[in-house]
């Protein structure tokens, strides 16, 4: 059987793993790549290609990087000249038109970072961690116009451990997504696998994370705050205030042994230890292990305490 000709659409590191898998697989030929335009990055804000573009250029692939593929019909015509039989979309970051979806013999397939229909939308990895899910995974779906609503070609699942953060889950899912492409995509193209419809009664939405969500509300539960800290490390992060200055939170854990809580107001420090501080919440106690003061690097609480004389009764969030 001849190689399956693939048009690949993707942008961040999550997509790089999938592109590498296709490039190394003798059953596929990547005939071209579509990605987001170069963006300013680093302290000097130099225009920098997306991770997918950098990999594509290293392999001398054709690359297009439109601001909006939807608004550029001539670019779609150019893509059609590549002769791709299927489009593989992994974290591309743009809405695709029905005309684009209909432009390939085997249609367009998408690697999505959740077990659909749970967590359709822009932030499935972060929302799974934030919600306290005990399982996640990746789905290979046949793309339709409605967001993340296509028939399912294949799924890979993984357990979420209590201390796993979104960056760690991201890396696991990226690898599982690549495995899905190398196995289920080939079965689908050969006609050996029939996609199955999603159960619309089980849909949950993973809305984009807004900056306003990053501030910790200490009146919520310790479990909810811990989930947000671990979930938002892949994205805007989380923060609170200490003595009027912003304090980013990087690593925490829920505990029952948090000092004398009594009727402590949420956000109150209930215990100060060498390697962590305990903070009262609306339900339970949260131990903080790593933080980042304004204009400083991330640091362990032990180092933070050397320059900040915290005591029981001090208040976070003000």
From Swiss-Prot:
InterPro entries: Fmt (IPR005794), Formyl_trans_C (IPR005793), Formyl_transf_N (IPR002376), Formyl_transf_N_sf (IPR036477), Formyl_transferase-like_C_sf (IPR011034), GART_AS (IPR001555), Met-tRNA-FMT_C (IPR044135), Met-tRNA-FMT_N (IPR041711). GO terms for molecular function: methionyl-tRNA formyltransferase activity. (6S)-5,6,7,8-tetrahydrofolate binds at residues 114-117. Pfam families: Formyl_trans_C, Formyl_trans_N. Keywords: Protein biosynthesis, Transferase. One of its GO terms (cellular component) is cytosol. The keyword Transferase applies. It comes from the Bacteria. Its EC number is 2.1.2.9. PANTHER family: METHIONYL-TRNA FORMYLTRANSFERASE, METHIONYL-TRNA FORMYLTRANSFERASE, MITOCHONDRIAL. Belongs to the Fmt family. Attaches a formyl group to the free amino group of methionyl-tRNA(fMet). The formyl group appears to play a dual role in the initiator identity of N-formylmethionyl-tRNA by promoting its recognition by IF2 and preventing the misappropriation of this tRNA by the elongation apparatus. This is Methionyl-tRNA formyltransferase. It comes from Bdellovibrio bacteriovorus (strain ATCC 15356 / DSM 50701 / NCIMB 9529 / HD100).
């Amino acid at each position: 059987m001849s190689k399956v000709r693939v048009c690949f659409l993707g942008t961040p590191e999550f997509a790089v793993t999938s592109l590498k898998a296709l490039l190394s697989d003798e059953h596929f030929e990547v005939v071209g790549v579509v990605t987001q335009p170069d963006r300013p990055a680093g302290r000097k804000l130099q225009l920098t290609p997306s991770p997918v573009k950098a990999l594509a250029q290293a392999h001398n692939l054709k690359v297009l990087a439109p601001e909006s593929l939807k608004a550029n019909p001539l670019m779609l015509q150019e893509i059609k000249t590549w002769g791709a039989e299927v489009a593989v979309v992994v974290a591309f970051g743009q809405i695709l038109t029905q005309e684009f979806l209909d432009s390939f013999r085997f249609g367009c397939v998408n690697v999505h970072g959740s077990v659909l229909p749970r967590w359709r939308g822009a932030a499935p990895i972060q929302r799974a961690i934030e919600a306290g899910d005990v399982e996640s995974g990746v789905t290979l779906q046949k793309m339709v116009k409605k967001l993340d609503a296509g028939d399912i070609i294949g799924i890979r699942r993984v357990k979420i451990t209590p201390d796993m953060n979104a960056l760690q889950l991201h890396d696991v899912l990226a690898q599982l997504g690549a495995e899905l492409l190398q196995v289920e995509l080939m079965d689908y193209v050969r006609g050996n696998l029939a996609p199955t419809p999603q159960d619309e009664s089980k849909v949950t939405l993973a809305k984009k994370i807004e900056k306003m969500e990053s501030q910790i509300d200490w009146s919520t539960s310790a479990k909810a705050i811990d989930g947000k800290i671990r979930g938002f490390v892949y994205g805007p992060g989380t923060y609170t205030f200490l003595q009027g200055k912003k304090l980013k939170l990087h690593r925490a854990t829920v505990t029952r042994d948090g000092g004398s809580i009594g009727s402590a107001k949420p956000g109150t420090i209930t215990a100060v230890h060498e390697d962590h501080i305990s903070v009262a919440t609306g339900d339970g106690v949260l131990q903080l292990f790593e933080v980042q003061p304004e204009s400083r690097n991330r640091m362990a609480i032990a180092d933070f305490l050397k320059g900040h004389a915290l005591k029981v009764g001090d208040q976070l969030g003000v």
